[in-house]
A protein has these predicted regions:
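Substrate-binding cleft/loops of secretory-pathway carbohydrate-active enzymes
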Residues: 128
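Metal-dependent polysaccharide deacetylase catalytic core of the NodB/CE4 family, i.e.
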Residues: 49-125, 133
C-alpha cells in the first residue's frame, strides 16, 4: 500500500469489511477557529501530500468549494451544543435547528462529530433523522 492509500475517509468505513479501516490513518481538521490563511495553507499541504482528509464544518467559508472539488476530502458537520447548554439561541433554539443551520452550509454532509464529545441518545437520533451515517 502506497503512502497516499494509507489514508482514508471515515465515511468509507464499513464495519463488516476490515479492508476499509485496517492499517489506515484518518486525518480530521476542525475549521472552527482556523483563520482563512491558516486553513488555506493546511489545505495546500494536505493536497500536496495527496491524502484523504475529513473537514469538520462549524461555519461557512469561501474555501468550501475548493474542498468540495477534491474527491479525497469529506465535509462533516460539527455542531457545538455548548450554546444550547448555556441557554443561548444564536446558533439555533433547538438541537434540530442548530443541525439544520449546518446542513444549510454543507448539504452534502452525511456525517457528524459533536464538539467536546457532547453526545446523547436524543442527539444521535436527530443526527440519524437528518441523514448522518457516521458519528
Amino acid at each position: 500500500m502506497g503512502f497516499s492509500e494509507t489514508f482514508g475517509c471515515i465515511s468509507n468505513i464499513h464495519s463488516d469489511d476490515p479492508s476499509t479501516w485496517e492499517n489506515k490513518l484518518f486525518i480530521t481538521f476542525d475549521i472552527d477557529w482556523a483563520h482563512y490563511d491558516v486553513l488555506s495553507d493546511i489545505i495546500d499541504v494536505v493536497e500536496r501530500a495527496d491524502v484523504a482528509a475529513i473537514w469538520f464544518v462549524t461555519r461557512d467559508s469561501s474555501l468550501f468549494e475548493h474542498l468540495r472539488a477534491n474527491p479525497k476530502f469529506d465535509l462533516w458537520i460539527h455542531p457545538n451544543s455548548n450554546f444550547l447548554l448555556a441557554g443561548e439561541t444564536r446558533k439555533g433554539a433547538t438541537a434540530s435547528e442548530m443541525i439544520d443551520r449546518l446542513i444549510e452550509i454543507v448539504p452534502e454532509a452525511k456525517d457528524v462529530r459533536s464538539h467536546f464529545t457532547t453526545q446523547s441518545s436524543r442527539l444521535l437520533e436527530i443526527f440519524a433523522d437528518k441523514g448522518s451515517t457516521h458519528d
